[in-house]
Amino acid sequence: MPRNVRCALIQASNALSTEKPLAQIREAMIDKHLKMIEEAARKKAQILCLQELFYGPYFCAEQNARWYELTERVPEGPTTRLMQKVAAKHRMVIVVPVYEEQMPGVYFNTAAVIDADGRYLGKYRKHHIPHCHPGFREKFYFTPGDLGYPVFETKYGRVGVYICYDRHFPEGARILGLNGAEIVFNPSATVAGLSEYLWELEQPAHAVANGYFVGAINRVGTEKPWSIGEFYGKSYFCNPRGKIIVQASRDKDEVVVADLDLDMIAEVRKVWQFFRDRRPETYGPLTTQSGASAAAAD
């Protein structure tokens, strides 16, 4: 019997001025996303992923401790609890990117994964934390992830998460494949002029190299007063052959929906035996910061 799964992505602009009280910003963004989740449900989506740090702006464009107030515990926090109810209502798996507080002063860029019956399955914490031009000052806000590369067994399929800047590192994408992922979601916040030319290269390459589907999500619009640039949207799904099968616009709030045939994974892997032909015993330099020179010295 074919394993077809209807999946959805939500890309959205910031709802309120960044100068408004944080509680108002959070409420406005959650209300906006709840309406879009309803749209995804009407389109019969079974698995849904929201964008990176979905309930606020991309505040990493500045270094300001004010934004620490957006943190919450996972899964005990209000956003995860709310989305558990929403997931159960719609019988929908939801990937929920939040700003997580582990303890005061220790924060993570996190995605909670909720099954279609509302059960919290676990979380992924972003591993690779950028601090670079034109305004990605994430080391001020986030501790590097410490939970590995989990794959979540949901009602509809095996789901992995790789957040934004993670996508530039093929190692974790490969581990997600080895861990059994069928669909990998990459919730992001990325702007034109820096990595847009990579947007449709890297993640289809991950899909091909690892034989799984990828859902890539980016927000839209500009967020003042920061001059980081335009978030260019263009959220998409691609299949294990690296083909983009549906893609959103670059400037509109959208719910992107695609039917994914999970049987394609086995079809592709019967042709391209990348997992069989791996040579992990030769990859020692990948586990050292200095690469081949350090491995040779050992």
Where are the language model's segments positioned?
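Acidic/histidine-rich helix-loop elements
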Residues: 15-27, 137-138
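Short beta-strand scaffold segments in enzyme catalytic cores
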Residues: 96-98, 110-113, 150, 235-237, ...
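Short beta-strand segments enriched in small/hydrophobic residues
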Residues: 1-16, 23
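C-terminal beta-strand edge segments of enzyme domains
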Residues: 218-298
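CN hydrolase (nitrilase-like) catalytic-core segments centered on the catalytic cysteine
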Residues: 75-95, 158, 164-255
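Active-site beta-strand/loop signature of hydrolases that rely on acidic residues for catalysis
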Residues: 7, 37-66, 87, 94-95, ...
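Active-site catalytic loop in hydrolytic enzyme cores
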Residues: 72-75, 85, 102-182, 192-205, ...
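Short, glycine-anchored, charge-dense loop/turn motifs used at functional sites
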Residues: 7, 113-121, 238-246
